[in-house]
Amino acid sequence: MAEITAKMVADLRAATGLGMMECKKALVESEGDMAKAEEILRIKSGAKAGKLAGRVAAEGAVAVFSSADGKKGALVEVNCETDFVAKDAGFLAFAKLVAEAAANSDAADVEALSAVATAEGTVEEVRKKLIAKLGENISVRRFQRFVTAGQLAAYLHGTKIGVLVDLNGAEALGRDIAMHIAASKPVCVSKEQVPAELLETERRVYTEQAAQSGKPADIVAKMVEGRINKYLAEVTLLGQPFVKNPDQTVEKLLAENKASVNGFAMFVVGEGIEKKKEDYAAEVAAAAAAAKG
């Protein structure tokens, strides 16, 4: 039997918003499996999915670059340690430099991107100079490059959320779609692209919830399909109500404009990274103990 720690209970409580005892029981039932415990709680409470991996904690910036003709571009996330550095002009310039380097190279991963030459030196050389200047660890976390026969459109919400859309259609429409993605955060373009494991988890949760209603099997099956269809509309770009006109879905908006979306990328700064929490009381105690020694 896995040991259930107070931190595990606290993390599950933060992710689900449910009571401490409920979370502890779910962890015991799942033998310490956090994802399984969250699923157990969703089944019992009817709660929506809350993903621990989605907790935003790290600092940094998202930057985007798109060529003048809108045929190639890149979205990047660069991380640092503090919000102060995240707002530094030199740090933000570095993020933009990395985005341009990613768009103009064939780098397949961050390691390869580090060796790409820029007007100021390689990405890695510029990064090290910036670390020496600002006194913080700075890292290129991820990037996504697009090359299209269509049109690229971008949207940045400050420096914390960035979207790059590949579409067949006007750039102005693309910017609206990119802004919608930043606001509504779809998982993918269409229901056919929803990951099978994600859909299976939702179906399992809905089935368990519907079964608890005590209704006949055929009614339960219809309830489950109804919930699945609603879920698909919520997480797919095409199924979502357009943020600037909720009476119209994005799919209908695109059809009216004879346009289509080939793909998109959305980065949220720090998504999936949990920042280390400083325990200053412990640091003082440790320093005092060291002084006595």
From Swiss-Prot:
Location(s) in or outside the cell: Cytoplasm
Listed name of the protein: Elongation factor Ts
GO molecular function: translation elongation factor activity
InterPro entries hit by this protein: EF-Ts_dimer_sf (IPR036402), Transl_elong_EFTs/EF1B (IPR001816), Transl_elong_EFTs/EF1B_dimer (IPR014039), Transl_elong_Ts_CS (IPR018101), UBA-like_sf (IPR009060)
Keyword Membrane: no
UniProt gene name: tsf
Domain of life, source organism: Bacteria
Keywords carried by this UniProt record: Cytoplasm, Elongation factor, Protein biosynthesis
